[in-house]
């Protein structure tokens, strides 16, 4: 059995998908689920699901399937969501506040302890019960609330400064939405999400589809 840290990143990224499906199955009181059923729910092949889970041990019985509650609890522990994860969002603009609202409503495994901004129009407000602090209070709140994950939704020019301040408070996981190349110590993991690049990549595929349709129309 491979240890948690040895699983490929592609496997790790599929685990939350499995967890979401398992959450829904538990809510529907489905006690046993097969890899074939998980395949239908996730879009991944049954073989891929079995291989992914095998990285972390044996969870089911051949011909019987997986105990849904047990598998869900194991996946929670593997990801690290069996304990509350505190999150700070830096940048309380449209993206930051939307991210906070979504997590409060849809993500029971994390707690957004605060949004941070410099605008007097929003500092002191509450977003879905999440307080908006001034950026000057970032390190104090991060330290007090034992924040483990930072979400960066500030303009690119300010993103590196935010990284440096979060790293100084021993935050080891950062989700960055700013279109900037950021640097951090080797033991800090940064996941970059550039929505503009994602949209442009999608347009490329949409263009191919449109070109194909245009060609067919000319035939």
UniProtKB/Swiss-Prot annotation:
One GO MF term attached to the UniProt entry? DNA-binding transcription factor activity
Keyword line: Cytoplasm, DNA-binding, NAD, Repressor, Transcription, Transcription regulation
Kindly report the protein's main subcellular placement as a broad class.
Answer: cytoplasm
Localization of this protein: Cytoplasm
**What residues are annotated to bind DNA?**
17-56
Function, as annotated, reads: Modulates transcription in response to changes in cellular NADH/NAD(+) redox state.
Family membership, please give it.
Belongs to the transcriptional regulatory Rex family.
This chain's protein is named Redox-sensing transcriptional repressor Rex
Q: Which organism is it from?
A: Natranaerobius thermophilus (strain ATCC BAA-1301 / DSM 18059 / JW/NM-WN-LF)
């Amino acid at each position: 059995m491979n240890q948690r840290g040895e699983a490929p990143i592609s496997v790790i990224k599929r685990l939350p998908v499995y967890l979401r499906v398992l959450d829904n199955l538990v809510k529907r009181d489905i006690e046993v689920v097969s890899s074939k059923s998980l395949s239908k729910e996730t879009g991944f092949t049954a073989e891929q699901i079995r291989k992914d889970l095998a990285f972390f041990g044996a969870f089911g019985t051949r011909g019987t399937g997986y105990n849904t509650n047990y598998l869900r609890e194991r996946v929670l522990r593997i990801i690290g969501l069996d304990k509350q994860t505190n999150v700070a969002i830096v940048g309380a603009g449209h993206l930051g506040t939307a991210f906070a609202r979504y997590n409060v409503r849809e993500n029971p495994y994390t707690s957004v302890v605060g949004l941070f901004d410099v605008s007097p129009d929003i500092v002191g407000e509450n977003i879905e019960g999440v307080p908006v602090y001034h950026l000057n209070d970032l390190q104090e709140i991060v330290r007090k609330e034992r924040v483990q994950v930072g979400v960066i939704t500030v303009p690119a020019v300010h993103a590196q400064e935010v990284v440096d301040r979060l790293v100084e408070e021993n935050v080891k996981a950062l989700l960055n939405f700013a279109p900037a190349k950021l640097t951090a110590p080797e033991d800090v993991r940064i996941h970059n999400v550039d929505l503009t690049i994602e949209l442009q990549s999608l347009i490329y595929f949409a263009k191919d589809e449109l070109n194909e349709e245009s060609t067919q129309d000319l035939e």
